[in-house]
Amino acid sequence: TLKPNESAVINVAYCALRLDEQFNLNFKNEQACREDFIKKLDDTLIIKTPNEHINLMARYAKIRGCESIFKTKSGLMHSPGGGNYYAALWTNDQCEYINPLFGYLGYEIGEQESINCYEMYRKYIYDDRAVITSIVAEGDDIWHGAKDRGDSAMYAYGLARFLLTYGDKQLAKN
């Protein structure tokens, strides 16, 4: 029982492992890594408006966007979260919205994820029909929702913005 003015720290870890993997968790080390991660993000793309609430929301959105990248069997994948869509890519969430931001941030993991995302979608680009809506199950399956050109437009728009902000001419030529 805590007495007035006392505090306690409770550490929680959400983890997933394959049966043959081992996991050693050092909460002090994890806390130090997280603080370093956030410090680095705080030094990039700082939004300053007259409204401190908007500034703080932009900071939190940047952190959340950068911490939502997972190593999968198909490479790095950004997930929109919510607990339902891990190891899946969407033309709106990843291709159009978050990936172009990574070109501005200089966040290497985000840049690698973006390149992987666009490459994974490349094999689903057709001349006669729309690009798929989502790549799911670590890249093993797809979901082709709307089946209209909206997903194709989101992919193309996001890719163009990412390539312009990332600034790699050779990658753009590919």
Role assignments for model-derived ranges:
Residues 39-173:
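Substrate-binding groove/exosite segments of carbohydrate-active enzymes
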Residues 2-18:
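Short Pro-Gly-centered flexible turn/kink motifs
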